[in-house]
Amino acid sequence: MVSREASILDALGAVGSVLVADLARDLGVSEVTIRKDLDALERRQLLRRTRGGAVLPERGEEGAFRDRLHRESAAKRAIAAEAATLVADGDVIALDTSSTAHHLALELLHRQGLVVITQSLPTAMVLLERSDARVIMPGGTLRRESSGLVGPITDALVGRGRIDKAFVGVVGLSPERGLLELATDEAVSKQALVAASDAVHGLFDASKTRGFALHSFARPEQVTSLITDARASDDFVEQWEAVGVPVARVPMPDTETTGTASVQARTGTTRRPTQKEHR
C-alpha cells in the first residue's frame, strides 16, 4: 500500500474520522492530493467521504472484509512487503480473498505485465484501477464475509496453463494437516488454486499460528513457504521446518530484526519439491 494511504487509514482507525486539512498538514502534501487519496480509498470501501474529510464506513455484514483489513494492519503490510519480493514482472499469480493478500496486491501495483487470478472483488478493483495487471476472476457466489466469490473454479483455470505462485491466507494451520480454512466453500476454492499452482505461499499474522479451523486446503507437501511476523514462536518455526517448509518471520515496524529470515534466503535449502472469518 502507498505509505500515505496507510497513514490515512491508521489515523482513521485511531480516531474514527479525519479532516483533509489536517492530513495535508501532517503528511506534507496538498489538500488536492489528499482528496484524491480519500476518493480512491472510498471506491475501495475503506472509508466514507464526508464534507471536508472522511469517517470509518458503517459496519454490517458487508463490513467484515474491511474490519479484517484494518485488524493487525501493520503486520499484514510487513508480510505483504516481504511476499512482494517473490513476484517478478510478468508472473502469473493467484491471490485469495484474504485481507493479507489484498495488502500484497497493493504492493504489486507497479509490477509490469502481471496476470492475477483472484476471487476477491476489492483486490480485483484495486488492480483494475491502479495497475496494468490482467485480472482473471473465476465466477461463483458472492460471499459477504470475504467480499469474494466462492464456488467451483477449476473450469476457469482449464487451458490457461499453470499459476506460477499462489498467495493465500489461513484461519489456522498445522504441520500435520497443512493450511486450514473454517468455511467449506472457501476451502474448496483454495484447493483448486493450490492444485493449479507451482508454488504456494501462506501469508498470515502470528495470531493465526493458534487459529482453529476444520478444512485443509493445502497439504504440508504442497506448501512452498510461510510468511508471518516476528511474533511467531521458535517452536512454530521449528515444527514447520521439520516437515520441510521454511518460515519467514518479518520484523514489525520498530521491532528488532534479530532472528528473522528472508524467504528468498531460505527456500533454496529447505523448500519442498514442487509440488471471526479469516486473516
Write out the residue ranges for each language-model feature.
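Short beta-strand element of Class I
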Residues: 115-116, 135
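Amphipathic, positively biased hydrophobic alpha-helical segments used for protein targeting
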Residues: 63-64, 94, 101, 180, ...
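A glycine- and small-aliphatic-rich helix-loop capping segment at beta-alpha/alpha-beta transitions
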Residues: 109-113, 184-185
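HTH-adjacent hinge/linker in prokaryotic transcriptional regulators
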Residues: 2-98, 105-111, 121, 128-132, ...
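Conserved phosphate- and dinucleotide-binding cores of soluble alpha/beta proteins
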Residues: 3-6, 10-22, 28, 43, ...
